[in-house]
Amino acid sequence: VQLFIILFLSVLCLTPNGEKHYSKVYYADGNIACEGWVQDSKKVDFWIFYHANGQVKNKGHYALGYREKYWHHYTNNGSLESEGHYLKGKKNNWWSYYNSTGEVIHKCQLHNDVKNGYCLHFKGNEIVKASRYSEGKKQQEWTDYTVFTRENNLLNLR
């Protein structure tokens, strides 16, 4: 881990001002840890990070050193674990979370990494529980999808 950090910092420090270049960082065993674009010592554009076993860990875009836009996160066996939007390095908008077979188990609205809006829990394709959050605090919970959609004036959220 220490070697990884040293290599990563040295790669970022070698970036000439204003010039964009492609960077690769490796684990101590020689496996790739991450790769992507660097400009003005900050991550920009598309990046891929890898687990120590070589499987993709996460991938997405950076802007001015912050995670931006849509990202995918994977388990160390390559299964999709979660996906959603970042804004200035914080999770925002809808995020989806998956089980090991690739089924959605949870969707949640986030604002600056905090639950803010609706969170839906699934079993198969059915919503089994819904909650509404405000600034990370649960405000209400429903276990009946029909009642939930009616009380909140919502259409199909599946």
Give the location of each predicted region.
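Glycine/tyrosine- and acidic-biased, solvent-exposed loop/turn segments at the edges of beta-strands
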Residues: 4-158
